[in-house]
Amino acid sequence: MSSDSNFDPWIPVCVVVVMTSVVLFAGLHVYLWYVRRQLVAFCLEKVCVRCCGKDETTPLVEDAEPPAELEMVEVSDECY
């Protein structure tokens, strides 16, 4: 008898365990990416300045035009 035959029943089990781990790992990353994207969209929609450590929130009005004196500011990584 060959010693290889002892490992034959474990091959499908190992394949199932590895494939399940890969699927769970990929699913978790996709879920976390989606949650982060939704959180950023929520903060941008609500102009959630508290996310950046400021004291007040200002709602975004979709039809309003930006003021002429509007300047571009760099957003820190803490907002995301």
Curated annotation (Swiss-Prot):
Topology within the bilayer: Single-pass membrane protein
The gene coding this protein: UL148A
Transmembrane segment boundaries: 10-30
Protein name, UniProt field: Protein UL148A
Claim: Zinc is one of the keywords in the record: no
Keyword list, A-Z: Host membrane, Host-virus interaction, Inhibition of host innate immune response by virus, Membrane, Transmembrane, Transmembrane helix, Viral immunoevasion
Gene Ontology cellular component annotations, sorted alphabetically: host cell membrane; membrane
GO biological process: symbiont-mediated suppression of host innate immune response
